[in-house]
Amino acid sequence: MKKIINAPENYVDEMLKGIYDAHGDQVKYVNGDLRCYCTAKKKDGKVAIITGGGTGHLPLFLGYVGEGLLDGCGVGGVFQSPSAEQIYNVSKEVEAGAGILYLYGNYTGDIMNFDMAAEMCEMDDIEPRSIVGADDVNSNANPDTRRGVAGIFFMYKCAGAKAAQGGTLDEVLAAAQKAKDNTRTVGFALTPCIIPEVGHPNFTL
């Protein structure tokens, strides 16, 4: 697979900087950290919705930060979770007095770091709630342990719309939960993945 990039080790940050340069009227990064994204304008009294995950599934995750969707996003390296501190910093930036809803995929690192960020928010008297996407029926027969991939978008949209209408944290969470409960996806690969910094396929087909 051919990739048009400069240095592989700079790929993620250069990509994020490019997106910011192209859409700086809609998004900004937090505390000078390119991997902490949020909307350019905060609406007081609105439930803040935050996601995050590893780079490599564009437009997930930062591509859905914007009006009527998400308020913020933590971005990790390729297939790496954002840190708890990054998620917390985004949370502090976008929190608007109505609580925070975390929506993210069912991956060990994401769960661990979002849980830690939630604990940090609670210490600041910010109320966090979480829903973990688990839509990919191809990854596991047990619904509780499935991956959360493409289907997470529907949680974004439903929760974002309810939050934009002025819904409470409970109402926004219920909208996201309904979307999760009614969404299934099937994930499959046609070619093996090549992580830029590794330079060769992760597996063979």
Regions found by a protein language model. Give the residues of each.
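Gly/Ser/Thr-rich loops at beta-strand to alpha-helix junctions
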Residues: 54-59, 105-114, 147-152
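Short, acidic/small-residue loops that bind anionic groups at enzyme active sites
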Residues: 73-81, 122-148
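Gly-rich Lys/Arg/Thr-decorated short loops/hinges at beta-loop-alpha junctions or inter-strand turns
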Residues: 44-52, 61-74, 137-139
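Short Gly/Thr/Asp-enriched flexible loops that form oxyanion-binding sites at enzyme active sites
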Residues: 111-125
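Internal, active-site/partner-interface "lid" segment
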Residues: 139-146, 156-205
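N-terminal amphipathic/basic leader segments beginning at the initiator methionine
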Residues: 1-49, 200-202
